Amino acid sequence: MCPQPHADHAITRGDTGAAGGRNWSGPFRKTPGRLVGMTLIRAYQLTLSSFIGNSCRHLPTCSEYGFEAIARYGLWAGGWLTLFRVVRCGPGGTHGFDPVPDSLAPRQRWYTPWRYWQPRRKDA
């Protein structure tokens, strides 16, 4: 059986649904690092993603997750979150609903990127 859906996801994250597009459209600071990272992910979505097919095990997809993570937390933290998400998506990894965390834990500092790894999510 499917777990209880997270109905508050669209409300708290600024998603606009199908009319707004597939990527996160909430507010974020437009720094050069964020814009570069988001541009690279968007270029991947428009070019290479169609060749790879629908093979992501998670919702949102890994590229949507990366776009949101970089928009919310910047290129460094969002990039690490995205890398670890792609690793979790591989064989033997997790599946299902796996959103970007609402906030980073205090122990997740820029100089300790290994702490961004979240092998298992606790259901709320």
Swiss-Prot record:
Do the record's keywords include Transferase?
no
As for membrane topology, the entry says: Peripheral membrane protein
User: What are the alphabetically sorted keywords of the record?
Assistant: Cell inner membrane, Cell membrane, Membrane
Report the subcellular localization: Cell inner membrane
Region entry Disordered: which residue ranges? 1-26
User: In its keyword annotation, does this UniProt entry include Aminoacyl-tRNA synthetase?
Assistant: no
> Would you tell me the protein name for this molecule?
Putative membrane protein insertion efficiency factor
Basic and acidic residues bias spans: 1-12
PANTHER family listed in its UniProt record: MEMBRANE PROTEIN INSERTION EFFICIENCY FACTOR-RELATED
Q: Which SMART domains match?
A: Haemolytic
Gene Ontology CC terms, in alphabetical order: plasma membrane
* Recorded family membership: Belongs to the UPF0161 family.
- Pfam families for the chain: YidD (PF01809)
State the organism's lineage.
Bacteria, Pseudomonadati, Pseudomonadota, Alphaproteobacteria, Hyphomicrobiales
The record's annotation in NCBIfam families points to: membrane protein insertion efficiency factor YidD
InterPro entries attached to this UniProt entry: Membr_insert_effic_factor_YidD
Role according to the record: Could be involved in insertion of integral membrane proteins into the membrane.
